[in-house]
């Protein structure tokens, strides 16, 4: 964007019209630089575009016209409402059927999981029974653990204490 000497006066008028004096100060700059800077700041500011400024005229209205309901024959209107009800009933039937199918699939899935669980529990019971039977078979051949029956050594003072407690009762 170049401004020459012929454009300077018009540019100055535009900047003075668009921007009141005193708001923008460019001290120590040439007049051409000041005008360019003013034009930049004016264009960079967030003023709403002129298209968005609503101006109400006598011949213009800002509201869209309201749609009027069509008047049709009574038989056509009842026929369309019947077809709508039939379509909605069909949709309900389709949704109900889809829901039943989904529920039956879930039921089959859960029954399969229950069957798998029972098989696992049965296998664990079988393994436990086998382990117990093997332990019973090998029980006579296992070395007997020595039982440490340590004799209690009761000191005389403990005996005396016990006797005193008995006499108090």
Curated annotation (Swiss-Prot):
Ranges for region Disordered: 1-21, 52-89, 144-169
Keyword list, A-Z: Cell projection, Cytoplasm
One Pfam family, short name: HOATZ-like
Biased composition (Polar residues): 75-89
Localization, UniProt: Cytoplasm; Cell projection, Cilium
GO BP: axoneme assembly; cilium assembly; flagellated sperm motility; spermatogenesis
InterPro entries: HOATZ-like
One CC-aspect GO term: cilium
Summary of the function given for this chain in its UniProt record: Required for motile ciliogenesis and flagellar genesis by mediating the maturation of the glycolytic enzyme ENO4.
Family that this chain belongs to: Belongs to the HOATZ family.
Protein name: Cilia- and flagella-associated protein HOATZ
């Amino acid at each position: 964007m170049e401004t020459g000497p012929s454009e300077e006066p018009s540019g100055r008028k535009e900047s003075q019209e668009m921007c009141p004096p005193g708001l923008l100060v460019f001290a120590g700059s040439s007049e051409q630089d000041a005008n360019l800077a003013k034009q930049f700041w004016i264009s960079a500011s967030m003023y709403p575009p002129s298209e968005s400024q609503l101006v109400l005229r006598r011949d213009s209205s800002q509201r869209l016209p309201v749609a009027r309901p069509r008047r049709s024959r009574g038989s056509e209107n009842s026929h369309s409402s019947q077809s709508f009800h039939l379509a909605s009933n069909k949709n309900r039937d389709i949704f109900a059927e889809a829901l039943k199918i989904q529920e039956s699939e879930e039921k089959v899935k859960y029954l399969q999981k229950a069957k798998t669980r029972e098989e696992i529990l049965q296998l664990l019971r079988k393994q436990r029974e086998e382990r117990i039977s093997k332990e019973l078979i090998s029980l006579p051949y296992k070395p007997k653990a020595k039982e440490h029956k340590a004799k209690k050594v009761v000191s005389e003072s403990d005996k005396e204490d016990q006797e005193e407690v008995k006499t108090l009762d």
